[in-house]
């Protein structure tokens, strides 16, 4: 059965991008949080670097997700304490969703890195684009083209930001989602991924991540 969960917490409506975007080269997108992320071994996480059908921010979203999967403990130690600086809507003081995320990532074992997949990307792109045009929130495809191109076993949708690290942190925290579905998908046993970030008439931006 396909897993379909989505993040629709109203707070994302007002998210202001904080996390800066930069081209990678040899510098990790997480280098600002610890120089340890610049270790050459983490370059394998940039699996979408040479992909021509994704934007730079979409590639970066896959990159930071793979970094979190490859070394969840280091991500927990270096990035999560700064989560509120990246998104002001993440409460790092004494909030249950954040605390459970820290506990999970501190003890979990490394996961495989995700490879970009064109079918997942087409699925995500169609949904992000059509949802954005009509201000839709959810997983149901809006037209026959998107229904035919739907390709995922797990899907995460985020509304309000186009900044890769902010998107990832909001999905990982999964505030207001008791099932923690987004967190479980992002840290789940998938192999392939497609990402699309598009304008949204209601929330300014929407991001769709399709996993297979």
Residues covered by each model-derived region:
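Bacterial Sec-dependent N-terminal signal peptides
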Residues: 1-25
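A well-ordered secondary-structure block
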Residues: 122, 126-212
């Amino acid at each position: 059965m396909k897993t379909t969960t989505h993040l629709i917490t109203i707070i994302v409506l007002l998210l202001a991008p904080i996390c800066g975007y930069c081209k990678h080269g040899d510098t990790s997108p997480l280098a600002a949080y610890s120089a340890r992320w610049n270790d050459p071994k983490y370059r394998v996480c940039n699996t979408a670097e040479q992909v021509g059908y994704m934007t730079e921010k979409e590639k970066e979203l896959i990159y930071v997700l793979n970094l979190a999967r490859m070394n969840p403990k280091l991500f927990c130690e270096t990035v999560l304490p700064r989560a509120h600086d990246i998104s002001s809507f993440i409460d790092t003081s004494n909030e249950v969703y954040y605390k459970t995320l820290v506990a999970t990532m501190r003890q979990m074992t490394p996961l495989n890195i995700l490879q970009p997949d064109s079918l997942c990307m087409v699925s995500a792109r169609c949904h992000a684009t059509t949802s954005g045009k009509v201000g839709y929130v959810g997983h149901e495809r809006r037209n026959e083209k998107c229904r035919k191109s739907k390709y995922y076993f797990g899907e995460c949708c985020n509304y309000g930001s186009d900044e890769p690290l902010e998107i990832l942190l909001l999905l990982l925290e999964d505030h207001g989602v008791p099932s923690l579905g987004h967190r479980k998908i992002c840290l789940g046993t998938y192999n392939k991924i497609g990402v699309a970030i598009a304008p949204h008439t209601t929330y300014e931006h929407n991001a769709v991540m399709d996993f297979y």
